[in-house]
Amino acid sequence: MDELERVYQSIKNIFTHSAPSEKLVGLQNRLSISLRFIEYAFETYQPERLAMSFNGGKDCLVLFLLCIYYLKEKYKEQAQAKLSNIPFVFVRPRDEFPEMDDFVNECQSKYRLNIIKISLPMKEAFCKFLKEHKHIQAILIGIRRLDPHGLHRIAFEVTDKGWPKFMRIQPILDWSYTEIWDLLLETNTKYCSLYDRGYTSLGGVSDTSPNPALKNPDGTYSPAYLLSDGSLERAGRNNTVPFSRTNSRFLYDSGASSYASSEVS
């Protein structure tokens, strides 16, 4: 079984479980909503006009798994070719962890990805990327509400004034910290090794530390998935923001026509 098929079957098993626990039912609901966003994104832009922001963190990894599931469901044996043609943009922190770079390289090899690494500040990085990939109109982003500037985001929105123009597609906004880890563990997906050393939110070396809430009496740290209070996810980062469980204002069932009205041309 190849890696894409493994991911597809592991998510399919969540949907088809004969006696799902309360946790799995919640995960089924969360998956269903996000997959509708992803379906609309791929139907509107087609894989040829989409890119994905990917730094190897847990959130973009979950979004990536959902995209694999959709591509396998839609394109069957052609899913790998579709996936390999999508540009994955890795905006590298100035002081990145070697483990993050190693994990991105591992994903590139394992899933046969077209990863484009850019060592510039975020805005300049996307300016450079879009200048070199003029056909790209929309970018999938694994932002969640706990992230800085994530609280009032919506699933589909054009970039802010002053940024290069593209459609931001943000299908996992309302996933909780626990739900992110539930999916990664349920699908037995390999993740960046830093998470097993107590890091719960990854940035650069200078602004990221193991989460103090996971520190053990002997000075070691428990794995990230054992953090019980999701509001402490960014406790190892600067500029933490409180978590608010707010449903997206841009729900799929509000009508697909409202998406098209703000489509990037």
Curated annotation (Swiss-Prot):
The keyword ATP-binding applies. Pathway: Cofactor biosynthesis; FAD biosynthesis; FAD from FMN: step 1/1. Its EC number is 2.7.7.2. It catalyses: FMN + ATP + H(+) = FAD + diphosphate. GO terms for molecular function: ATP binding; FMN adenylyltransferase activity. Keywords: ATP-binding, FAD, Flavoprotein, FMN, Nucleotide-binding, Nucleotidyltransferase, Transferase. One of its GO terms (cellular component) is nucleus. InterPro entries: PAPS_reduct_dom, Rossmann-like_a/b/a_fold. It is an enzyme of class 2 (transferase). It holds the Pfam family PAPS_reduct. GO terms for biological process: FAD biosynthetic process; FMN metabolic process. It comes from the Eukaryota. Belongs to the PAPS reductase family. FAD1 subfamily. Adenylates FMN to FAD. This is Probable FAD synthase. It comes from Schizosaccharomyces pombe (strain 972 / ATCC 24843) (Fission yeast).
